[in-house]
């Protein structure tokens, strides 16, 4: 009986007692205490205790004794219903639920999964995954905090099956023993069909009988595990105020609000959560949700694929023939990492080989495999063409798929099926052939075989009909599809655009024509090219285009003439190549591009992976990608991010960029590793280069020396140097100091987020040097003074460093912008700066003092300093304990601050109240050029970087 306390909690039962019964319970309890001579519990405290307090007092006696006393007293006050319920709960409810789950999950083989592939996945993954999840969700040592674990992986990789396998293991007692009394699985695609619900209702849907013991289930939330699958299927607003969320498990809410309340710990904060989603959705949510761990759902590796091919074919020679085709085709190989798609590809190849077809031709492009698989489901083996009914059924599915893509629906009810021409009598056939699957056994909710199958069906719809012929007004035209796909507006559109282009292949058009029995419109080619043509010359629109998606579309189309025309619409491209397959696609397109002016890319770790088996082929692709620098002679800007180069790869890049005719103006290499090769420093010797950004790329002391040697060369014209987050040391400052004294071109130096500390002194001495040549920005006028910018945010500067900075402000009249946010300057250091700001030689325009630990002790000095510096236009005081509003309303300072504000053009502050806001509104009326930005709460956790990068709401629409 002791498990009653730990499993269900005493408090719920005490709350079931009315006031009179509760008083009787206390009286009997006092008698028990006296009879048993229990010293742990005071009779006086029992008399005064609330229900919650009484539960805690009882537990001091130990769980066994607490239960024994509670059980006896409930019988004495004639609440046998509670004792019976508790006894039933202890023995029955958890076991009843586990048995229900065990039966449901053991026999749950929905048609959407081929049984063989499902069994294979269970056999391959379940034990490893069960152990991993147990480690992630069980507290270590004495730690008791609830867990929130994310499972992320690409769509269709098998996350749902993994979670259901975990549920099955829990129901069998193989994992989480004594950790969770209940584990509930909610799928967002399923749940969002309800529109509104309470948590109690969601739990009841999973219960084996109509009446779930909700109170008992929720009585001890730390024993609950909620598994929430497919977060990408729900619209989330994680910016809602906490007051807009819900903590009542019985209250109906919009399901997105209900699940947000769980995720953000407003509801049942003691419970544990296991969440699954795609990497894209995880990226959007990770900053908003405090998760404890992240697990990546691993796809099929090569060994697993090979084993599965052999099991399916049961003919060693044919299995090897089919798998070799997949292994040689990197796009197919990538697709086969998704278990269900591996089954689909293997099945297609098996059928093609068995009927004596051409499997090589089938494997040329991904679209071909999908259409071959889908059409084969609707054509009986004995027939050559589909029946009229089969044509109508597939056309209805394509209409349904298109509606789902536009409404973010992947679970459909019967009404949606009927609206799109699928009758009730069609459903058994569609379930039987595996095009649809049931998501819940006893409800009329249906899903496609796989999200990518829904996407290819939606693409087929656009080959058959115009959007105005669709029964839903949500469905838009093909041009809108293309732009939304290329701009990644809808994260769940993974292949849609690629399939549309793939279906325009001549062979696919013929295949569609044969299946549906009529010729298709040839106008779609022209429409898509017109879309791409609108990109030409539109820099803002091109900036939004995901280059890899554009490449994938053109690759799938396999039309070189169209490819050349399309690529020459682009003047700038931004892409991320995450694997070998992406390299093949990018190389195919970039080698035909000759109009680029701006290129931005990331190759992550692809060029420096340990697996050398395909490095030679990879470098051929890399050569083709870099040929764009030879073809596009007008590239002015190159941005490389998050990339690890090996020596051959960086050498290829250098050889492509070194031509004298190549006049690169701007080079950005953020978080880039060039290995031990110093080719980078050969690259930046290009005399046309004016902007160099190496932020977040580690620079050794020797590399800093090499960099500065180049900056010292007479032919070097670099004006802006960004080296934030480069792990520079104080010793490096001496080297940069020499640059400041000798460089005739350098105007902007950003050293933010490097631990410079005492090195600031060397920099400041250089800035004060009489031979410092920072004089001219552009030689148009002999009187054009440099607006020199110095960024030292988060550099470990203390009060001592302010003394050196103060000397710079007094001696260097060219210093217009000083950013020293996120340094511990404190009042002492700021007062030194204030003294310098008042100096007649100080011409500062922009001063950033965000989060510098300034207090009210500095406000008077700041007032007078700002008043005397007539050039100051931008002031940032956010994130300090210092209140600007006090400066205004202290005696003698209101007029002074008004004077200052009337001369500023930008003011950033924090902690304003209504009275101060009214003052600012009055200032705004007098100074129309003033932009005021603020934050009610300072973001004290931000570390380093540029204050300009912050996003802050306006104080009001008027301000």
Curated annotation (Swiss-Prot):
Subcellular location(s) of the protein: Cytoplasm
Binding of ATP, residues: 153-160
Tissue expression profile of the protein: Expressed in the ovaries (at protein level).
SUPFAM superfamilies for this protein: DEATH domain, P-loop containing nucleoside triphosphate hydrolases, RNI-like
UniProt-listed Pfam families: LRR_6, NACHT, NLRC4_HD2, NOD2_WH, PYRIN
Disrupted gene: phenotype observed: No visible phenotype, however female mice produce fewer offspring. Delay in embryo compaction and blastocyst cavitation. Disorganization of the mitochondria in zygotes around the pronucleus and subcortical region following nuclear envelope breakdown. During oocyte maturation the endoplasmic reticulum and mitochondria are aberrantly distributed in the nucleus and cortical region at the germinal vesicle stage, in the subcortical region after germinal vesicle break down and dispersed throughout the cytoplasm at the M2 stage. Loss of cytoplasmic lattices in oocytes.
Region (Disordered) residue spans: 938-959
SMART domains the UniProt entry points to: LRR_RI, PYRIN
Residues annotated as domain NACHT: 147-470
Coiled coil start-end: none
Cited InterPro entries: DAPIN (IPR004020), DEATH-like_dom_sf (IPR011029), Leu-rich_rpt (IPR001611), LRR_dom_sf (IPR032675), NACHT_NTPase (IPR007111), NLRP_HD2 (IPR041267), NLRP_innate_immun_reg (IPR050637), NOD1/2_WH (IPR041075)
CDD domains xrefs: Pyrin_NALPs
Biased composition, class Basic and acidic residues, residue ranges: 939-951
Keyword Nucleotide-binding: yes
Lineage top rank: taxon: Eukaryota
Keyword entries, A-Z: ATP-binding, Cytoplasm, Inflammatory response, Leucine-rich repeat, Nucleotide-binding, Repeat
Task performed by this protein: Required for cytoplasmic lattice formation, thereby modulates the distribution of organelles during oocyte maturation and zygote development. Required for preimplantation development in female fertility. May be involved in inflammation and recognition of cytosolic pathogen-associated molecular patterns (PAMPs) not intercepted by membrane-bound receptors.
Annotated family: Belongs to the NLRP family.
Entry protein name: NACHT, LRR and PYD domains-containing protein 4F
Source organism: Mus musculus (Mouse)
Gene name of the encoded protein: Nlrp4f
């Amino acid at each position: 009986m002791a498990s009653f306390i730990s499993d269900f909690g005493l408090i719920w039962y005490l709350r079931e007692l009315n006031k009179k019964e509760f008083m009787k319970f206390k009286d009997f309890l006092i008698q028990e205490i006296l009879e048993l001579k229990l010293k742990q519990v005071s009779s006086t405290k029992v008399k005064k205790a609330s229900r919650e307090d009484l539960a805690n007092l009882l537990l001091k006696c130990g769980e066994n004794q607490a239960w024994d006393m509670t059980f006896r007293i409930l019988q004495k006050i004639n609440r046998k219903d509670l004792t019976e319920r508790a006894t039933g709960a202890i023995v029955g409810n958890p076991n009843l639920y586990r048995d229900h789950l065990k039966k449901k999950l053991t026999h749950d083989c929905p048609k959407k999964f081929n049984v063989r592939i499902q069994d294979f996945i269970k056999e391959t993954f379940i034990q490893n995954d069960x152990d991993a999840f147990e480690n992630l969700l069980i507290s270590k040592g004495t730690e008791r905090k609830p867990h929130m674990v994310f499972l992320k992986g690409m769509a269709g990789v098998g996350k749902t099956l993994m979670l259901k396998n975990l549920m099955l293991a829990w129901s069998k007692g193989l994992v989480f023993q004594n950790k969770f009394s209940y584990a509930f699985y909610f799928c967002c695609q399923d749940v969002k069909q309800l529109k509104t619900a309470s948590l109690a209702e969601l739990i009841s849907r999973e219960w084996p009988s109509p009446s779930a013991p909700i109170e008992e289930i929720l009585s001890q939330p730390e024993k609950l595990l909620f598994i929430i699958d497919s977060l990408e299927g729900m619209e989330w607003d994680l910016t809602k105020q906490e007051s807009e969320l819900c903590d009542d498990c019985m209250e109906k809410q919009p399901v997105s609000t209900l699940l947000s309340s769980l995720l953000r710990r407003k509801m049942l904060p003691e419970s544990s959560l296991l969440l699954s989603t795609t990497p894209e959705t995880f990226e959007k949510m990770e900053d908003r949700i405090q998760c404890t761990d992240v697990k990546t759902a691993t796809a099929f590796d090569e060994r697993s694929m090979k084993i599965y091919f052999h099991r399916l074919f049961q003919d060693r020679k044919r299995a090897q023939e089919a798998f070799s085709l997949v292994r040689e085709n990197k796009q197919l190989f990538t697709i086969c990492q998704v278990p269900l798609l591996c089954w689909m590809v293997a099945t297609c190849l098996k059928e093609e080989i068995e009927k004596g077809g051409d499997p090589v031709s089938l494997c040329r492009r991904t679209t071909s495999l999908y259409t071959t698989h889908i059409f084969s489901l609707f054509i009986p083996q004995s027939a050559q063409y589909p029946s009229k009914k089969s044509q109508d059924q597939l056309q209805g599915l394509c209409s349904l798929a298109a509606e789902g893509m536009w409404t973010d629906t992947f679970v459909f009810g019967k009404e949606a099926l009927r609206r799109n021409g699928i009758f009730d009598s069609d459903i058994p056939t569609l379930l039987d052939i595996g095009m649809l699957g049931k998501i819940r056994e006893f409800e009329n909710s249906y899903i496609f075989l796989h999200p990518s199958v829904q996407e290819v069906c939606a693409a087929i719809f656009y080959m058959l009909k115009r959007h105005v012929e669709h029964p839903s007004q949500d469905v838009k035209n093909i041009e809108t599809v293309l732009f939304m796909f290329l701009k990644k507006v809808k994260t769940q559109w993974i292949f849609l655009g690629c399939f549309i282009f793939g279906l325009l292949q001549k062979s696919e058009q013929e295949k569609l024509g044969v299946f549906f029995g009529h010729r298709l419109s040839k106008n779609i080619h022209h429409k898509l090219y017109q879309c791409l043509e609108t990109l030409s010359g539109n820099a803002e629109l091109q900036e939004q285009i995901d280059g890899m998606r554009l490449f994938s579309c053109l690759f799938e189309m396999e039309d070189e003439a169209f490819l050349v025309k399309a690529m020459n619409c682009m003047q700038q491209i931004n892409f991320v190549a995450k694997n070998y397959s992406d390299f093949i696609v990018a190389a195919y397109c970039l080698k035909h591009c000759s109009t680029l002016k701006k290129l931005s890319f990331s190759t992550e770790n692809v060029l420096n992976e340990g697996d050398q088996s395909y490095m030679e082929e990879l470098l051929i692709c890399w050569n083709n990608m870099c040929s764009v620098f030879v073809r596009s002679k007008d590239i002015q800007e190159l941005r490389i991010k998050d990339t690890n180069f090996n020596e051959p790869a960086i050498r290829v890049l250098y050889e492509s960029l070194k031509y004298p005719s190549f006049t690169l103006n701007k080079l950005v290499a953020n978080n880039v590793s060039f290995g031990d090769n110093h080719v980078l420093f050969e690259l930046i010797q290009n005399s046309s280069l004016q902007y160099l950004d190496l932020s977040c790329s580690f620079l050794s002391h020797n590399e800093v020396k090499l960099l500065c040697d180049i900056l010292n060369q007479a032919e070097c014209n670099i004006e802006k140097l960004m080296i934030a987050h480069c792990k520079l040391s104080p010793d490096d400052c001496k080297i940069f100091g020499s640059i400041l004294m000798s460089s005739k071109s350098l105007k902007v130096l950003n050293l933010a987020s490097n631990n410079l500390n005492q090195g600031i002194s060397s920099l400041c001495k250089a800035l004060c040097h009489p031979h410092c040549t920072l004089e001219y920005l552009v030689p148009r006028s002999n009187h054009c003074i440099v607006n020199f910018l110095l960024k030292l945010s988060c550099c470990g500067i203390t009060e001592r460093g302010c003394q050196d900075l103060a000397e710079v402000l007094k001696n260097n009249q060219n210093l217009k912008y000083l950013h020293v946010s996120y340094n511990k300057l404190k009042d002492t250091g700021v007062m030194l700066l204030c003294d310098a700001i008042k100096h007649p030689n100080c011409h500062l325009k922009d001063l950033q003092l965000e989060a510098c630990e300034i207090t009210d002790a500095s406000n008077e000095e700041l007032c007078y300093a700002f008043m005397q510096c007539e050039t100051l236009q931008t002031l940032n005081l956010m994130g300090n304990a210092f209140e600007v509003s006090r400066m205004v309303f202290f005696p003698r300072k209101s007029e002074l601050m008004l004077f200052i504000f009337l001369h500023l053009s930008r003011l950033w502050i924090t902690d304003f109240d209504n009275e101060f806001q009214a003052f600012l509104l009055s200032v705004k009326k007098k100074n129309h050029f003033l932009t005021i930005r603020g934050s009610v709460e300072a973001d004290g956790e931000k570390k380093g970087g540029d204050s300009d990068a912050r996003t802050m709401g306006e104080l009001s629409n008027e301000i």
